[in-house]
Each structure stands twice: as structure tokens, then as C-alpha cells.
Amino acid sequence: MNEYKIQVINPCQEFLDDLKEYNLPVHNQLCDTIKEVISIPFKSKFKRLENSDRDMRARSGNFRIVYFVKNDTIFITKIGQHKNVYKMDVGCPKLSKKKLRSL
């Protein structure tokens, strides 16, 4: 079994850091899904995005984690609510503290 490294782009890391501070349950849920992606990135429940040969998505409640695998590294490029994540070019939404608490 391959061992994968993880690379989280900076806006996604900032989003996770903010969630940790203002909404720990959602943060923990996303981190659990990221750990699952690291262990088996091509698991059947993780879907390939339409119109993409490389990008995959993992579902975590109302959130989606978009990533791709290159060699032995998993690159997380987007994290967001399912209604918005596919519209984003790359990264994560900038949300107020109040909005983060209400997720």
C-alpha cells in the first residue's frame, strides 16, 4: 500500500485553522475525511469530478474536499460547502467569524 504525503494549499489551510477556532465539530469532521482520503485516496466513495481527468472529491457532510493525486502526494485544492465549492476557482471561501460558527 502506498504512503501519501499531503499538501493543503494555503487558503484551505487558513479555512481549516479558522474552523478549528470557531467551529470545532465541523473542523473535526473535515479532518476525519482528510485522514480517510490520505489512507485510501481512490476509495470508491470518493468520486472523480465531471470534466476532469485528475480532480477527485470527498464528501464530508455538507462540505466537499476537492483534491488530486500526483505521484505520492495528495494536493487539496478546495474545501467548501457543496453549493459553492465547484464554482470556486481554487481555495476556500472567506467567511466571517459569525458565519463560521453557524456552519
Model regions and ranges:
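Arg/Lys-rich, positively charged N-terminal/basic patches that mediate binding to nucleic acids
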Residues: 1-33, 103
